[in-house]
Design a protein with these regions (language model features):
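His/Asp/Glu-enriched, well-ordered alpha-helical/loop segment
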Residues: 277-356
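C-terminal cap of metal-dependent C-N hydrolases
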Residues: 348-401
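Short, acidic/polar
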Residues: 73-81, 162-173, 218-226
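N-terminal metal-binding scaffold of metallo-dependent hydrolase/deaminase domains
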Residues: 1-42
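Alpha-helix-loop-beta-strand connector modules within alpha/beta enzyme cores
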Residues: 111-117, 130-152, 199-209
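Active-site mouth loops of central-metabolism enzymes
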Residues: 62-75, 153-166, 185, 212
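Metal-associated gating/positioning segment near the N- to mid-region
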Residues: 44, 50-135
Length: 414
């Protein structure tokens, strides 16, 4: 599909921007992979008629765990990324490659598959050193630059903090495209955490914490004190992955930290609703971003992003169009990346949504608020239609149609 593409008959146009989440326009022109015009209807080689359905920026999953290619070893599942894209997600942010078999084993005592592997003769300490975690982060970054199942954008450049890093490691990581340092498992000393934090800031790496029920360093018992020392840019799964931090640490992050507050599908949804309400009271909804924390021990849920939006709409007064911003524009901005918005000049990563066929509702926003399922009928990434029609079991009410206009004949030709 080359040349300009015009989306027309858009019923509801969502922008991904909290300042004006719904745009007063019925058309969007895409060319060269980029949104060129909004609200105009010029001639275009390809016209996509939405028949009144909703057009929105593709969702960003701010907390995904990519492995190699589209295989998830913990679930022994192929195709999780492709199914995630078909469910309306166009961008994945890696929260770290934490579960590569044999490459990063958190603990021989944890009651999970990694402990099982350690029990069979593996040495978990061996995979837990600065050299190994750095090599893995660089390898994943390289691999996901070219591996794009269904065209997905996957930012895989996340490295775990480990004991033993020196400043040159950070220089090397930054030069190799690593964009985020994540405190995942406790490192030994809080002084090292503070040093890593300053190197990350110096070299332009974002800092994310595994925000849960354990301290980030071994020499500090208080979860809150370790969070204070690390001063994260992003408090990863502040509602737990799966168990949240104590409420006083969560409230400290909201009231005194400056971090983006990430809420994930697999966490504690009551705590997520609490964070959302507090952020709304503080007029700080721009700090909230949404993710899945999948695939992982909890399973593979390709529709997790929409489901999280829906559940949070039931548990709070925040309208669906604002929750969509937390899964699109907010995330792009927090990660300092382009996209997540329906705006001129932004990448054309777009999804056409409509209520499931049998729903009593007739509009995507009403459908999600009501509690029915909505489905994408068309998904575009970088101006390329990667899915049309619905390969999932159920269909949206209004399926977009694609019309190709014959190219204009050159003057003088017959
Ligand atoms: Zn995670």
């Amino acid at each position: 599909m080359n040349g300009p593409i015009l989306f027309r008959n858009i019923g509801t146009l969502l922008s991904g921007d909290l300042a004006h989440p719904m745009l007063d326009a019925t058309s969007v022109l895409v060319d060269g992979g980029v949104i060129r015009e909004i609200g105009t209807e010029p001639d275009a080689e390809t016209v996509i008629d939405l028949h009144g359905a909703t057009l929105a920026p593709g969702f960003w999953d701010s907390h995904f765990h990519p492995y190699f290619g589209d295989y998830s070893p913990r679930q022994r599942v192929n195709g999780a990324v492709e199914r995630t894209v078909v469910s309306g997600v166009t961008t994945l942010i890696s929260a770290g490659a934490g579960h590569q078999p044999g490459m990063y084993l958190p603990s021989p005592t944890l009651p999970n598959v990694q402990a099982g592997s350690a029990g069979h003769g593996g040495d978990p300490r061996r995979a837990r050193d600065a050299r190994g975690t750095k090599a893995l982060a660089i390898t994943m970054t390289e691999a996901w630059r070219t591996e794009r199942p269904s065209g997905v954008k996957c930012y895989a450049g996340t490295v775990f903090a480990e004991d033993g890093f020196v400043r040159d490691d950070f220089v090397d990581l930054a030069a190799n495209g690593i964009r985020m340092l994540k405190f995942q498992r406790p490192i030994s000393r809080i002084a090292d955490a503070e040093t890593y934090r300053s190197w990350a800031a110096e070299l332009g790496l974002l800092v994310m914490t595994h925000t849960g029920n354990r301290s980030m360093t071994k020499d500090v018992a208080s979860i809150r004190d370790s969070l204070r020392a690390i001063d994260p840019d992003i408090a990863g799964h502040v509602n737990g992955g799966p168990t949240p931090a104590p409420r006083e640490a969560v409230d400290w992050l909201i009231d005194h930290g400056r971090a983006a507050l990430e809420l994930v599908f697999i966490g504690n949804l009551r705590v997520a609703a609490h964070v959302l309400r507090r952020a709304a009271e503080r007029d700080e909804l721009h700090r909230v971003i949404l993710g899945s924390d999948l695939p992982g021990g909890t399973g593979v849920v390709p529709g997790a992003m929409l489901r999280t939006i829906q559940l949070l709409s039931h548990l709070s007064d925040v309208p669906v169009e604002l929750l969509v911003c937390m899964a699109t524009g907010n995330t792009a901005r927090v990660h300092r990346l382009p996209g997540g918005l329906v705006a001129v000049g932004e990448p054309a990563d777009l999804v056409a949504w409509d209520p499931v066929e049998a729903s009593e509702t007739d509009d995507f926003l009403d459908c999600v608020a009501y509690g029915d399922r909505a489905y994408p009928g068309l998904i575009m990434i970088d101006g390329v239609v990667v899915h049309h029609g619905n390969p999932l079991l159920l269909s949206p009410k209004r399926m977009p149609t694609i019309h190709r206009n014959a190219p204009a004949l050159a003057a003088g030709s017959v």
